[in-house]
Each structure stands twice: as structure tokens, then as C-alpha cells.
């Protein structure tokens, strides 16, 4: 179910304050975060945010198209290695 419009989008305060500080000083640094639930705001555009996927931080460069999505959408947590190509030989 989608979030109620009257509540507005969610972003963790610590992440927003880090981005605001970088925007004031006009620095470009990688910001590490564990907050996959945070919504991407227009202030994030042009920054690289390292989102934790359960074992490492995945660097995500924020573009205009990503605004409104969640950070976790761009750091997949599961690795799919694929099925065995020739499964018939093992069944005989």
C-alpha cells in the first residue's frame, strides 16, 4: 500500500542534514547510509550516496529521474546466479 499523501514523503533526518551540509559547502563526497527507506529528494541530485545492501555499501549517483523513488530500489539485496544451463544430464 502506498504512503498517504497527507503525510508527505519520508527521509531520515541524519541523511537530510548530511546532504544539506554538503550543499552549503558545495562539496561532492560519498555519503554512507543504511537508510534504504528514505525517499530521494531534489536536493540529492548530483550527489553519490552509498546505500547498504546487507553486506556492502553500493554507490548510487542520484539523477533527476530518481526523485520520488526510494534509495533501496537502486541497491539490490539478492544476487541471482541463474539456473543450471544443462539440467537434463543430471536427471538421467
Curated annotation (Swiss-Prot):
Keyword rRNA-binding recorded: yes
Protein keywords: Ribonucleoprotein, Ribosomal protein, RNA-binding, rRNA-binding
GO molecular function, one term: structural constituent of ribosome
Record SUPFAM superfamilies: Ribosomal protein S19
Keyword Ribonucleoprotein: yes
One Pfam family hit: Ribosomal_S19
Signal peptide annotation: none
HAMAP family reported in the protein's UniProt record: Ribosomal_uS19 (MF_00531)
Family stated for the protein in its record: Belongs to the universal ribosomal protein uS19 family.
Name the UniProt record assigns to this protein: Small ribosomal subunit protein uS19
Organism this protein belongs to: Bacillus cytotoxicus (strain DSM 22905 / CIP 110041 / 391-98 / NVH 391-98)
Amino acid at each position: 500500500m502506498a504512503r498517504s499523501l497527507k503525510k508527505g514523503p519520508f527521509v531520515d533526518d541524519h541523511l537530510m542534514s548530511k546532504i544539506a551540509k554538503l550543499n552549503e559547502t558545495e562539496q561532492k563526497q560519498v555519503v554512507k547510509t543504511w537508510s534504504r527507506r528514505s525517499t530521494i529528494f531534489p536536493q540529492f541530485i548530483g550527489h553519490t550516496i552509498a546505500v547498504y545492501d546487507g553486506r556492502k555499501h553500493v554507490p548510487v549517483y542520484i539523477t533527476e529521474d530518481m526523485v520520488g523513488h526510494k534509495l533501496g530500489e537502486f541497491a539490490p539485496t539478492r544476487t541471482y546466479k541463474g539456473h543450471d544451463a544443462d539440467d537434463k544430464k543430471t536427471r538421467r
